[in-house]
């Protein structure tokens, strides 16, 4: 507990919050180039082959980013858009690739949750009477 005089002289220091996605440098998105596309297995209770890509961002940092959805078109040297967001069962994967941006197509045949997977809207023909 500080004394009154210590508070007058030094004040209270506010804690600085640590960023969960430091490579984005306070930006919502960063563009980058895909270096490697690979599959990894998740932590203990889960079992799958999760698709991730190693991406070199525009600020020269290299990160591992998760590729969401069922099928993907991510290849080496593709230009991708990266957003923050951890994958709970993949250690070291703190970023997601945005589908439907730059060289990456969205998930085809998606009817619900389309914006998350970059799926286009099926236009409904309206006839005038």
UniProtKB/Swiss-Prot annotation:
<feature type="modified residue" description="3-methylthioaspartic acid">
    <location>
        <position position="89"/>
    </location>
</feature>
<comment type="subunit">
    <text>Part of the 30S ribosomal subunit. Contacts proteins S8 and S17. May interact with IF1 in the 30S initiation complex.</text>
</comment>
<keyword id="KW-0820">tRNA-binding</keyword>
<keyword id="KW-0687">Ribonucleoprotein</keyword>
<comment type="function">
    <text>With S4 and S5 plays an important role in translational accuracy.</text>
</comment>
<dbReference type="Pfam" id="PF00164">
    <property type="entry name" value="Ribosom_S12_S23"/>
</dbReference>
<dbReference type="GO" id="GO:0019843">
    <property type="term" value="F:rRNA binding"/>
</dbReference>
<keyword id="KW-0488">Methylation</keyword>
<dbReference type="GO" id="GO:0006412">
    <property type="term" value="P:translation"/>
</dbReference>
<dbReference type="InterPro" id="IPR012340">
    <property type="entry name" value="NA-bd_OB-fold"/>
</dbReference>
<dbReference type="InterPro" id="IPR005679">
    <property type="entry name" value="Ribosomal_uS12_bac"/>
</dbReference>
<comment type="function">
    <text>Interacts with and stabilizes bases of the 16S rRNA that are involved in tRNA selection in the A site and with the mRNA backbone. Located at the interface of the 30S and 50S subunits, it traverses the body of the 30S subunit contacting proteins on the other side and probably holding the rRNA structure together. The combined cluster of proteins S8, S12 and S17 appears to hold together the shoulder and platform of the 30S subunit.</text>
</comment>
<dbReference type="GO" id="GO:0000049">
    <property type="term" value="F:tRNA binding"/>
</dbReference>
<dbReference type="GO" id="GO:0015935">
    <property type="term" value="C:small ribosomal subunit"/>
</dbReference>
<dbReference type="GO" id="GO:0003735">
    <property type="term" value="F:structural constituent of ribosome"/>
</dbReference>
<keyword id="KW-0699">rRNA-binding</keyword>
<comment type="similarity">
    <text>Belongs to the universal ribosomal protein uS12 family.</text>
</comment>
<dbReference type="InterPro" id="IPR006032">
    <property type="entry name" value="Ribosomal_uS12"/>
</dbReference>
<keyword id="KW-0689">Ribosomal protein</keyword>
<protein>
    <recommendedName>
        <fullName>Small ribosomal subunit protein uS12</fullName>
    </recommendedName>
</protein>
<keyword id="KW-0694">RNA-binding</keyword>
């Amino acid at each position: 507990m500080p004394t009154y005089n210590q508070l007058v002289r030094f004040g209270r220091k506010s804690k600085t919050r640590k960023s969960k996605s430091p490579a984005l440098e306070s930006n919502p998105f960063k563009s980058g180039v895909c270096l490697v596309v690979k599959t990894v297995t998740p932590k203990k209770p889960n079992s799958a082959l999760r698709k991730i890509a190693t991406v070199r961002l525009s600020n020269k940092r290299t990160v591992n980013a998760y590729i969401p959805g069922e099928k993907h078109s991510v290849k080496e040297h593709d230009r991708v858009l990266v957003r923050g967001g951890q994958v709970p069962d993949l250690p070291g994967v703190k970023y997601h690739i945005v589908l439907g941006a730059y060289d990456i197509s969205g998930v085809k045949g998606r009817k619900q949750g389309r914006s998350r997977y970059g799926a286009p809207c099926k236009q409904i023909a309206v006839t005038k009477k």
